[in-house]
From Swiss-Prot:
Native source species: Thermus thermophilus (strain ATCC 27634 / DSM 579 / HB8)
Keyword Cell cycle recorded: no
Entry protein name: DNA-directed RNA polymerase subunit beta'
Gene of this entry: rpoC
UniProt binding sites for Zn(2+) 2: 1112, 1194, 1201, 1204
Enzyme class: transferase
E.C. designation(s): 2.7.7.6
Molecular function (Gene Ontology), one example: DNA binding
Length: 1524
């Protein structure tokens, strides 16, 4: 058994779910190999992932045929199966870093933003890597304020928090710093000449350009001094005194050798060498002067130096140790000396200093690193490094802690206040920060910074979403809902709705971030070879390719450990690639096709819009067994027939024909039959005969686009015709809005017998005679048919002898013989009005009269006397002929004569009434026959009448000249009055327009009077009078004058066009006329689009409204008023007959009504006769309004009941259950939309007067519940009006007991009330359109419903469109379907939440039953667009508009579509739950008498069994299988 879908749910997919759908990961961007044309491995078309390209064949061809089904080839890894799997097997791309789903980011309001309380801009800054978001602040403080979770940080702020506050000061080349590297500085201190620190902190050098190494030199040297002069010490510091000599002293050589003198800045060394080996080294302190020179040979005992006064150590040399040997009066000192020798090294930009300031180095240590090893600086000896000339100085906010012993932290550690740094706990940090240990200076620096966790990109957002505790957030927001501020409550409600959507649906917020991207099956994004060997591919493949390329590049960069900035950029590009795939162009510029500017179609584009999946492929599809061709008129056809070209029928009915050919033996089998048909020339006559048999009894559907209402598709019995054109019955043209100037129509064949039966019963053209919009005939005589019938039923009126009086008939006849009196001239005989024809030709029966016409004795238009059914009729043979035609068609002469009015010619309206009355009295079949008869004779007589138009038929009346002269005189007077200042410019303009309007009217009357009196059979006049073609305005322009014309702005030219078309226009007149004509053309084009869109919106809002039950049982009703206030006097007057009919016809009476002695019972369907009775009663003052059931008050959910809806207007009988009345309503309102004007009338620059919206824009404004531009001020309370006037403004007070309401108005406001008037709430005080929302607040829903129906009807009536009120009521009901919660009571609802009235009412019933507080609500008025988008069915809403928004909301809430309306069922390919698809029809069984009897017996038996005593029932056992 086929499974039936009952509900459809949409939800978010988790990363695991996406991977579970996938058959493998797509790792490469390749599609197919350009040489072998086979899919690349791991690419977007890989057969291992998506399945084989050929049925039951692996990629390498090892396994072929079905017997290997399910086997995976060990060579190529492809599963042997059908290739169709490539339409539904998905792959996936594993993202290197998570990416956000753009729908949940860019939706308004953003779903992710709402959950995390981030604005759209903030969210975007994080996702696209321009700001960090804080995941864990770890106590961080920024500018004295604690950092909070989810706070956004700029790059600078993040660096300051993470790495400390720091400022960089660049130094020019060659300038040395005034502070040392690592020195503490204060704000305002000079760091280098002209460079001042703006921060307290530690100065750190960046890129020193010069390094000075102070190498440590050591030497052991001797010195003999007088013992008495020696200042004895164990060691000497630089500059200390060695000896105080009272008299000069000579220092002598104690060995012989060659002198080597090494001079220092102060002091010197003297080395004696023998054979290049040093034999003695002497130290010459400051105060001792050498007496020998370098290279001199000295003897033992020779003086080397002379000393005087104080001998001291040089400033740069110290003696670390002294050994003294006393010899008599002298002492020999052995000094262990140390001193430094500085050496500078330049550091080039490509070199890098690797040791800090003040560091000690050993010989061989590297000081400066370089790319080229030869450029590196290596320590020559032990020494201390000093840095100079930094490129910049970095001042870091840090605390410096000196220490003595051990350090307990190491560089890079993070510490908090109170953490131990050194000296066994004596030194502790008092800030958060990062440690830098400086062993040179014995300090620990703590750079003030925080171990803050802040990140960028979707990764950060995903983490935050994962951490969300939705339950806690819900509680927090519920508390926020109690806040006094309305704005705060509204914001909390929006967030709460999203939070609850996640909680109730079981979706997780982090699923809005993608870790893996699903890859669409390849056959849904195909790549095909086009002519010339090139490939055409779906845009999706390009988008996937970009994504894979970027993903792979990011993976590679991450593996290589690329710098953060490069990774960040690549991640951003990956996010953008995911965005482009999901919804190209939603953010930033769209990705375009290389080589053109066309944006690529992303997944969103494939779904949404007119060309999207929903509207293009699901709501409507192209079908097989269809064709189209040009239409031509088929006057010989019956109403239910159409002419189908033979060749077309051959193709459309091919399968049936092939079977028939095989059955009849024309061809041995189907294959031969098909070949026979393909060879066009070989088609034999018996094939055509077989085709005739095949189509016998079948119907086809004809459709003309645009299909504005259901009569745009009708069923016809095909009749085979020669040629290539479809022949259409002339009387269905009106329903199709077809004409024969090149229109085309489509043909469809219903295939199954069910479809054939449904088309024949429901859709046959002969079964659709009345309009579903108004109940008036749609199939009615028109154009030539009217002309022909009018021609034969018109009577001649002749002037000759008119008005003469005769004593006897004989005298009159004699005068006629003499030629004094015309046959049809009105005369009096013995005081009775008659004519010669009536006296001369008296026929015993109608047949005689027609015989006289046939013999040329009388004309069809002459008035004669005929006896019929015992009555003496004075009428024309033409009218008798017409009655005969009708009688023959309906096969009932008595009824025919009753239906026809014999005293008037048959024009458009009387023919329409005839058809309608025939339908009511005789039914559908006979009416169809009548229509065919009228068609046949109408064409016949319009042909034989020879009516044609010539230029001379446009007769200009003689009075025109004098009327124009008169107008010119009055014009002069107006101009003079203006010149003299008696009129303002505006008054002058208005009076001139008034004058010309009156003149035009006079000329029009003159034109028609002239025709009527002098040319009654003038073709122009006949056409206009009969309603066949043309209207009085057109005739006026042909024969009278064109009149006033419109300016492009919409105002009127004050200069009229005086000429008629017959006379011809002057150049100026032609020019003036052109504006209006052009505006008309432009209007039509705009109107068509707007009207179509309105229809679509109406269908979307009403499609679920179906007649679902017989009676909803409501006691509510609406009262249809029979009177209305006059526009000018405001006094009540009876409404127009047509308006009352549109409000009452076909409705069910809600209360019993007794009028004019007739009792109309409650529950009665009001026929047209009943309506006319009620109108008569209203005229007699017996009744003011009629209580009727209405869709507005119906209690049926998702539809209406039979009683509240009333008649199915197209059948003039109560509506059937299952009828899709919502769509009928939408089509009925939308279809005439193109006939409405587009005009916005301009008031011509009057100050303060706004434009009055009319026509289609007004209808749209009302259905969209927009606030009108020129708004009327309405009273909010009942009370008495008091008006106060000041210099600047008007004040209108409405006063009721103890309460007054003031309305301040501009001075030029046009009031509708005067002092002392009593007004009700909702009544307008000024002119203008009422704002329906204000009316709803002031007067409640019933007033708004009435207002909307009445205002919409006004626009349609103005254009002469007939439309039943109930169609508008159905739409208005959908607009009033929603309510807003004002107090949630004890429910889970939220204040301000909008939901359907039904839901709230059902909830309240439950709450009251449980003894809880019910929900308080107020009614809402919603425009049709908003109402359609708010529908519970997400499928319907998504296929209407804003697809992404609807799907986003639905997915988050995990919405289920219950498939109640029509659209959602069409989308799923199910039968629609209306008409024959409704459960009521599908599960209703038709039973015969025998079955009925069996059911009745079984029922009786069941009742008896119940009534038997319990004991007996226990004993008797049912026989198995015998069940009632």
């Amino acid at each position: 058994m086929k499974k039936e879908v009952r509900k459809v749910r949409i939800a978010l997919a988790s990363p695991e779910k996406i991977r579970s759908w996938s058959y493998g990961e797509v790792e490469k961007p390749e599609t197919i190999n350009y040489r072998t044309l086979k899919p690349e491995r791991d690419g977007l078309f890989d057969e291992r992932i998506f399945g084989p390209i050929k049925d039951y064949e692996c990629a390498c061809g090892k396994y072929k045929r079905q017997r290997f089904e399910g086997k995976v080839c060990e060579r190529c890894g492809v599963e042997v199966t059908k290739s169709i799997v490539r339409r539904y097997r998905m792959g996936h791309i594993e993202l290197a870093t998570p990416a956000a789903h753009i729908w949940f980011v860019k939706d308004v309001p953003s779903k992710i933003g709402t959950l995390l309380d981030l604005s759209a801009t903030e969210l975007e800054q994080v996702l696209y890597f321009s700001k960090y978001i804080v995941l864990d602040p770890k106590g961080a403080i920024l500018n004295g304020v604690p950092v909070e979770k989810r706070q956004l940080l700029t790059d600078e702020e993040y660096r300051e928090l993470r790495y400390g506050k720091q400022e960089t000061y660049p130094l020019p080349p060659g300038v040395d710093a005034l502070v040392k590297d690592g020195e503490e500085v204060v704000k305002g201190q000079e760091l280098a000449p002209g460079v001042v620190s703006r921060l307290d902190g530690v100065a750190l050098y960046r890129f020193p350009r010069r390094v000075r190494v102070e190498y440590v030199k050591k030497e052991r040297a001797g010195l003999r001094l007088p013992l008495a002069a020696w200042v004895e010490k164990e060691a000497y510091k630089p500059g200390e005194i060695l000896a105080e000599l009272p008299e000069p002293y000579l220092f002598r050589a104690e060995e012989e050798g060659v002198v080597e003198l090494k001079e220092l800045e102060e002091g010197a060394f003297l080395v004696l060498r023998r054979e290049d080996e040093p034999v003695a080294t002497y130290f010459l302190p400051v105060g001792m002067t050498p007496l020998v020179v370098h290279g001199e040979i000295v003897e033992k005992g020779q003086p080397l130096a002379e000393a005087k006064g104080l001998l001291r150590m040089p400033r740069q040399v110290r003696a670390a140790q002294v050994e003294a040997e006393e010899e008599g009066e002298t002492v020999y000192l052995t000094l262990f000396l140390e001193w430094t020798e500085p050496k500078d090294y330049r550091v080039q930009p490509h070199m890098n200093v690797v040791v800090p300031e003040g560091a000690r180095v050993e010989a061989g240590d590297k000081i400066v690193a370089a790319i080229d090893p030869e450029e590196e600086v290596i320590a020559e000896a032990e020494g201390v490094v000093h840095l100079h000339e930094p490129a910049s100085i970095l001042v870091v906010k840090a605390r410096v802690y000196p220490f003595e012993d051990d350090v307990e932290v190491s560089t890079g550690d993070r510490v908090a206040p109170g953490d131990v740094l050194a000296d066994g706990g004596k030194v502790k940090s008092d800030v958060y920060g990062r440690v830098e240990v400086d062993l040179v200076r014995n300090v620990v620096r703590v750079v003030e910074s925080y171990d803050i966790d802040a990140r960028m990109g979707a990764e950060a957002i995903q983490q935050l979403l994962k951490e969300l505790d939705l339950e806690a957030l819900e509680k927090e927001l519920l508390e926020e809902m109690k806040h006094p501020s309305r704005a705060r409550r509204a914001k909390a409600r929006k967030r709460l709705e999203v939070v609850r959507a996640f909680l109730d649906s079981g979706n997780r917020p982090e699923w809005m971030i993608l870790e893996a991207v699903p890859v669409l099956p390849p056959d849904l994004r195909p790549m095909v070879q086009v002519d010339g060997g090139r490939f055409a591919t779906s845009d999706l493949n390009d988008l996937y390719r970009r994504l894979i390329n970027r993903n792979n590049r990011l993976k590679k960069l991450l593996a290589q450990g690329a710098p953060e900035i490069i990774i960040r950029n690549e991640k951003r590009m990956l996010q953008e690639a995911v965005d482009a795939l999901l919804d190209n162009g939603r953010r930033g510029a769209p990705v375009t096709n290389p080589g053109s500017d066309r944006p690529l179609r992303s997944l969103t584009d494939i779904l949404s819009g007119k060309q999207g999946r929903f509207r293009q492929n699901l709501l409507g599809k192209r079908v097989d067994y269809s064709g189209r061709s040009v239409i031509v008129v088929g006057p010989q056809l019956k109403l239910h027939q159409c002419g189908l070209p033979k060749r077309m029928a051959l193709e459309l009915f091919k399968p049936f024909l092939l079977k028939k050919m095989e059955e009849k033996g024309i061809a041995p089998n189907v294959k031969a039959a098909r070949r026979m048909l393909e060879r066009q020339r070989d088609i034999k006559d018996e094939v055509w005969d077989a085709l005739e048999e095949v189509i016998h009894g079948k119907v086809v559907l004809l459709n003309r686009a645009p299909t504005l209402h259901r009569l745009g598709i009708q069923a016809f019995q095909p009749v085979l015709v020669e040629g290539q054109s479809i022949q259409l019955h002339p009387l269905v043209c009106e329903a199709f809005n077809a004409d024969f100037d090149g229109d085309q129509m489509a043909v469809h064949v219903p295939l199954s017998s069910f479809a054939q039966a449904e088309a024949r019963i429901q859709m046959l053209s002969a079964h659709n005679l009345l309009s579903p919009a108004s109940g008036e005939p749609l199939a009615k005589p028109s154009r030539d048919i009217i002309l022909g019938l009018y021609y034969i039923t018109q009577v001649r009126k002749e002037k000759k002898g008119a008005g003469l009086e005769f004593a006897t008939p004989e005298e009159a006849l004699a005068a006629h013989e003499r030629g004094e009196v015309a046959l049809n001239a009105p005369i009096k005989v013995a005081g009775r009005e008659t004519s010669v024809g009536r006296l001369k030709y008296v026929f015993a029966n109608p047949d005689e009269a027609l015989l006289a016409v046939a013999h040329g004795i009388v004309d069809l238009q002459d008035v004669v006397t005929v006896r019929y059914m015992g009555k003496r009729l004075e009428t024309s043979p033409g009218r008798i002929l017409f009655a005969r035609i009708v009688a023959e068609a309906v096969e009932d002469e008595k009824v025919a004569w009753e239906l026809i009015q014999l005293d008037v010619p048959q024009e458009k309206n009387s023919l329409k009434d005839l058809v309608y009355q025939a339908f009511l009295r005789l039914g559908m079949e006979k009416t169809a026959r009548l229509l065919d008869a009228l068609k046949y004779y109408g064409f016949t007589f319009s042909t034989t009448s020879g009516i044609t138009i010539g230029i001379d038929d446009a007769v200009i009346p003689e009075e025109k000249k004098q009327y124009l002269e008169e107008a010119d005189r009055k014009l002069l007077q107006i101009e003079q009055a203006y010149e003299m200042g008696f009129l303002t410019d505006r008054e002058r303009y208005d009076q001139i327009l008034q004058l010309w309007t009156e003149t035009t009217e006079k000329v029009t009357q003159a034109v028609f009077k002239n025709f009527e009196e002098n040319y009654p059979f003038n073709p122009l006049y006949v056409m206009a009078q009969s309603g066949a073609r043309g209207n009085p305005q057109q005739i006026r322009q042909l024969c009278g004058l064109r009149g006033l014309m419109q300016k492009p702005s919409g105002e009127t030219f004050e200069v009229p066009v005086r000429s008629s078309f017959r006379e011809g226009l002057t150049v100026l007149e032609y020019f003036i006329s052109s504006h209006g004509a052009r505006k008309g053309g432009a209007d039509t084009a705009l109107r068509t689009a707007d009207s179509g869109y309105l229809t679509r919106k109406l269908v979307d809002v009403t499609h679920e409204i179906v007649v679902r039950e017989a009676d909803c049982g409501t006691t509510n009703y609406i009262s249809v008023p029979l009177f209305q206030p006059d526009e000018v006097t405001r006094s009540l007057r009876l409404r127009k007959r047509a308006d009352i009919e549109a409000g009452l016809y076909g409705r069910v009476l809600a209360r019993e009504v007794e009028v004019l002695g007739v009792r109309l019972e409650e529950g009665r369907y009001l026929s047209m006769d009943d309506v006319h009775l009620l109108i008569k009663a209203a005229e007699a003052g017996e009744i003011q309004e009629v209580p009727v059931r209405s869709p507005l008050t119906c209690q049926t959910r998702y539809g209406v009941c039979q009683k509240c809806y009333g008649y199915d207007l197209s059948m003039a009988r109560p509506v059937s259950i299952g009828e899709a009345v919502g769509i009928v309503a939408a089509q009925s309102i939308g279809e005439p939309g193109t006939q409405l004007t587009m005009r916005t009338f301009h008031t011509g620059g009057v100050a303060g007067a706004a434009d009055i919206t009319q026509g289609l824009p007004r209808v749209i404004e009302l259905f969209e519940a927009r606030r009108p531009k020129a708004k009327a001020v309405i009273s909010e309370i009942d009370g008495v009006v008091r008006i106060e006037e000041t210099e600047e403004k008007l004040s209108v007070f409405v006063e009721s007991e103890g309460f007054s309401k003031e309305y301040k108005l501009p001075k030029e406001a046009r009031l509708l009330v005067k002092d002392g008037d009593y007004v009700e709430a909702g009544q307008p005080l000024t002119r203008g359109a009422i704002d329906p929302h204000q009316l709803l607040e002031a007067k409640g829903p019933e007033a708004v419903e009435r207002y909307l129906v009445e205002e919409i009807q006004k626009v349609y009536r103005a254009q002469g469109v007939k439309l039943h009120d109930k169609h508008i009521e159905i739409v208005v009901r959908q607009m009033m379907k929603y309510v807003e919660v004002t107090d949630p009571g004890d429910s889970r609802l939220l204040e301000g939440q909008v939901l359907e009235k039904w839901d709230v009412e059902a909830l309240n019933e439950r709450l009251i039953a449980e003894g809880k507080t019910p929900v308080a609500w107020k009614p809402l008025l919603m425009g049709v667009t908003k109402s359609a988008l708010s529908t519970k069915s997400w499928l319907s809403a998504a296929s209407f508009q804003n697809t992404t928004h609807v799907l986003t909301e639905a997915a988050i809430a995990g919405k289920k579509d219950e498939l109640i309306g029509l659209k959602e069922n069409v989308i799923l390919g199910r039968l629609i739950p209306a008409g024959t698809g409704s459960d009521f029809v599908r599960f209703t069984q038709v039973v015969d008498q025998k079955t009925l009897k069996a059911i009745e017996e079984a029922r009786k038996e069941a009742v008896e069994a119940k009534e038997r005593p319990a004991a007996r029932r226990g004993v008797k056992r049912e026989q198995p299988g015998k069940q009632a």
